[in-house]
Amino acid sequence: LSLIVDEKSPEALPNLDFKIMQGNSLLEQYKGVDLSTMTEKKIGAGESLTFFDSMLDVYRKNLRDKLTEYYACPEHDKKMQLRKDIADIVKQELVEQGIHIDFEDMDLSANSQFFLWHTWFHDVFSRPSKEGFDIVIGNPPYGAKISSIDKACFKHIFTSAQTIPNIQKGSLDTFSLFIDLGYQILHTKGNAIFIVPLSVTASDAMSGLHRLLINHCDEIYVSSYGDRPRRIFESAEQQVSIISFKKSSNKATRIMTTHINKRY
């Protein structure tokens, strides 16, 4: 806000109405159905069209058009109607593919089952040569109870959750999964920063996450904090680390850490 106050001619803040959402952001699938390709073109150049494929492309074009209108809409009421229209198109597309999921009582933009990253943020993931977010910031939950079904899904989605004999141990702690997710949704050269439990630095269960970041991030910075002389969060007796990294196609060229800031 101070930057805006100091500006001679401050520009209007972006409309965040359509960007504030909730959901199970670790999953972009539901009951085994992949929901990440709702906006992708089904037919490539030179491929033959079937009626089924052409109908899917119609739904996906309608969805992309509605999303473009949704992003540009300044009116709250109209935006809510567009959100409903988008949800209806998603449901129609699934039915067209023979996928019958009962979404009747489920809000596709706010539910505890999944989150449609590539639909609601189509503008972010469709940028040429820059597919993904510039910045990801998180204070993820940790120690959550995970069903056996979700565990199997996470092991398929996140490389850091996979245990590979003699190479790495995988972790299914939610904070580790969120760091992996943050890495996935960044574009190359994008930056992420998370505040998470201190165990991210030393637990052998984090070796899968360490391997992912070291092999695919240019720079990694870690600052660690104890709970004395003062807690980072007054209401939580938790030692934490702040980890930031820059996504890359190369191995890490710089890893910087602090000694744990702790005093008895």
Residue ranges and their predicted role:
Residues 1-52, 66, 115-264:
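Signature of N6-adenine DNA methyltransferases within the class I
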Residues 37-132:
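Coupling/switch/interface segments within P-loop NTPase motor domains and analogous charged loops
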